[in-house]
């Protein structure tokens, strides 16, 4: 029996984001295959996760492509909050969808400092949510993604993208 990535908790999210980053750099899902790199399978077939379909991957990929050129990283606190809200409150994206309900505003109030600058960048990047169609079969997907993203925001993994502890310490110039 094949072990599913979601059973590992937020590690499935890490793999998903890494895949999306790789996929956006290469130009599309047809450039990479799950077997040997010979363009044999598409996004929908690479991930055997129940409820995860191509529209979910595409939506996350669009979010990542919009934040990266503006010096925002998906691991930043504000970016995590926005991604969680975007994936969790799909009523803003899909008001006609029967499986979602209305939620509060997608962006928090403005705050001073670095966090305020990040919020301003995100507010400029996402003035209105893009319309993406979701059917009843994808309702489960939004809830799972939202739950995992909320868990990642609350309990981020330490050390994955961080610099090694020796970087910047005790450097000797030649």
Swiss-Prot record:
Residues of the signal peptide: 1-29
GO cellular component: cytoplasmic vesicle; endoplasmic reticulum; Golgi apparatus
Region annotated Disordered, chain positions: 88-113
Ranges in a coiled coil: none
Entry keyword annotation includes Membrane: no
Main location: endoplasmic reticulum
Subcellular location: Endoplasmic reticulum; Golgi apparatus; Cytoplasmic vesicle, Secretory vesicle lumen
GO biological process, one term: in utero embryonic development
Presence of keyword Transmembrane helix: no
Short name of any one Pfam family annotated for the protein: RESP18
Keywords, sorted A to Z: Cytoplasmic vesicle, Endoplasmic reticulum, Golgi apparatus, Signal
InterPro entries: RESP18 (IPR024833), RESP18_dom (IPR029403)
Protein's job: May play an important regulatory role in corticotrophs.
PANTHER family (UniProt xref): REGULATED ENDOCRINE SPECIFIC PROTEIN 18, REGULATED ENDOCRINE-SPECIFIC PROTEIN 18
Protein family membership: Belongs to the RESP18 family.
Protein name (database record): Regulated endocrine-specific protein 18
Organism phylogeny: Eukaryota, Metazoa, Chordata, Craniata, Vertebrata
């Amino acid at each position: 029996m094949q072990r599913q990535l979601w059973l590992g908790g937020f590690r499935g999210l890490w793999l998903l984001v890494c895949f999306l980053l790789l996929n956006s750099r290469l130009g599309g899902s047809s450039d990479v295959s799950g077997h040997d790199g010979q363009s044999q399978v598409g996004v929908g077939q690479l991930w055997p996760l129940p409820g995860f379909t191509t529209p979910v991957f595409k939506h996350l990929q669009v979010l990542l492509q919009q934040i990266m050129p503006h010096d925002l990283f998906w691991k930043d606190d504000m970016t995590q909050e926005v991604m969680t809200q975007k994936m969790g409150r799909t009523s803003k994206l899909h008001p006609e969808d029967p499986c979602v309900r209305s939620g509060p505003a997608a962006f928090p109030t403005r705050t001073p400092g670095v966090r305020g600058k990040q919020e301003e960048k995100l507010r400029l990047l996402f003035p209105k949510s893009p319309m993406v169609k979701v059917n009843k079969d994808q309702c489960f997907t939004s809830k799972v993604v939202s739950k995992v993203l909320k868990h990642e925001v609350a309990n981020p993994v330490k050390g994955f993208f961080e610099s090694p502890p020796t970087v910047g310490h005790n450097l000797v110039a030649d």
